[in-house]
């Protein structure tokens, strides 16, 4: 599995390189809130670096923020909604425009890594797997 380079067409780049940091900072709370549910896989600095380098895309909204990444699997390319924080209604509505953007990038599907509640909100998504984690640091 590799991450597709979307630096030439990502929403982050459309902000302009000088605006990425400012927009990220404006949305830091939404991103930090979403990271609380990520199992400690990334720091907020990791997310900023991924957005700044084009590995992930920053989708700033009025009352929310979504972070996506385009992932090439061997048989298809997906746009993964990696982090989402803020107003639930706005996030659900924004998914539609992100899906349009993803299709324009050659994505075959959308994918969401998130809490179980997203399944109730996004009726056109199908649960295809369950992610289980076990913390080995204290064993």
What are the residue ranges of the model-derived segments?
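Intrinsically disordered, low-complexity boundary segments flanking structured domains
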Residues: 1, 46, 67-71
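Short amphipathic alpha-helix that is part of the acyltransferase structural core
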Residues: 1-42
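Active-site/acyl-donor-binding loops of N-acyltransferases
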Residues: 2, 113-116, 120-139
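Generic structural motif
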Residues: 18, 71-73, 86, 135-139
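Charged/polar, solvent-exposed surface patches and flexible loops
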Residues: 22, 26-29, 33, 46-50, ...
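Active-site rim helix/loop that mediates acceptor-substrate recognition in acyltransferases
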Residues: 35-56
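Conserved donor-binding loop and adjoining core beta-sheet/short helix segment
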Residues: 51-89
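Acyl-donor binding region in acyl/amide transferases
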Residues: 76-124
């Amino acid at each position: 599995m590799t991450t597709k380079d979307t630096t030439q067409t990502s929403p982050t780049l459309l902000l302009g390189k000088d605006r990425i940091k400012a927009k990220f900072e404006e949305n830091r709370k939404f991103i930090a809130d979403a990271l609380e549910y990520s199992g400690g896989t990334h720091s907020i600095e990791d997310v900023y670096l991924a957005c700044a380098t084009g590995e992930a895309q920053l989708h700033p909204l009025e009352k929310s923020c979504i972070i996506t990444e385009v992932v090439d699997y061997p048989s298809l390319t997906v746009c993964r909604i990696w982090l989402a924080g803020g107003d639930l209604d706005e996030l659900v509505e924004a998914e539609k425009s992100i899906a349009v953007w993803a299709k324009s990038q050659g994505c075959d599907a959308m994918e969401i890594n998130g809490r179980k509640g997203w399944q109730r909100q996004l009726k056109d998504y199908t649960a295809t797997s369950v992610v289980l984690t076990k913390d080995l640091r204290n064993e």
